[in-house]
Amino acid sequence: EYKEGSRKISAYYRETDPKKLAQLDTIFKQVMASLHWLEDYTGVSYPFAKYDFIILPGFQYGGMEHTGATLYNDNQMFLSEHPTPDEELRRTELIAHETAHMWFGDLVTMNWFDDVWTKEVFANYFAACISEPLYPDINHQLNRIKTFTASSLSEDRTPGTTSIRQPLDNLRNAGLIYGQIIYNKAPVMMIKLVELMGEDKFREGIREYLNTYAYSNATWNDLIRILDNKTAEDLAAFSDVWVNQKGMPTIRFTQKDGKLQICQEDPYHRGITWPQRFHVTLCGEQRDSILEVNLTDSLCTLPLPFPVRYILPNTDGRGYGLFIPDSHTLPWLLAHWQETADDTAREALLMLLYENYQAK
């Protein structure tokens, strides 16, 4: 049992190892920190009578967000005597994820299982917001592209890929819609949504959403309607492409007459474009430079500030899709990618090469 002010939390467990049980104080404090953060962010006090948790041996999931009795897997809560920073981060993220579900999934529940992904994308997004500042020495952008982007691309490149939101006519088939797209592409989309409208406006919308639909049901479109009123951006159009359509764009780069042309194509020929932002690194004889690209249409033309030898797409890993460099850059990149000093850029370029290989 752990008390902080008027709040009391109880833990139930089978573990008897004193060294592992000594971790309970850290676990309790992380639960409390997640509760405080979510209350402050949402403006909504913890919405249920209690927050107790049960640490189960051999539990098949990392956690399960039952109100008043959250379930956790013992191996993910009781760590080894000398855990790595990544193991500690995963535990913090798990606690934050399940705690976020108290607001997103329990306080407001999806109307039907075709929107089951919404509670997962909220939990993943807010778990990152809570956890990442606590581990400043970890490259979180690198982790995001290794986890979310790489995993979702592995499915999105295949003929069997699906949209994030999928129709479900019978509850017995609900298990079929879980996978890389729900758990990994949805967070990619959410990060882009927040980037598009701005963090402050997003937070305003989240507060209105929770207050409007507390202790009831809501759809993703209900949220988008609220968020759409907070910004001049067309979030309905953004959502239709990123949430309702399957697949990923093919983005080609060419250089001509001192200009960079970026062409976005839909492999399914539906005439849609995926709005997104990413960095392009320009490599010249004397210097390099980074361009911030805001891709909103099928064709984007940008002036090059100096003579450029190589154009490296998506070097910050924020972009999503199959990035095809110009014919001069691709063979050079294949021979020199490992020389890139920045870890995030090196991973993003390696993933670019891998996706180009898979597309052959």
Where are these regions (language model features)?
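Low-complexity, intrinsically disordered regions enriched in charged/polar residues
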Residues: T158, D200, N217, A232-E233, ...
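Beta-strand-rich binding/interaction modules
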Residues: L235-A236, M248-T315
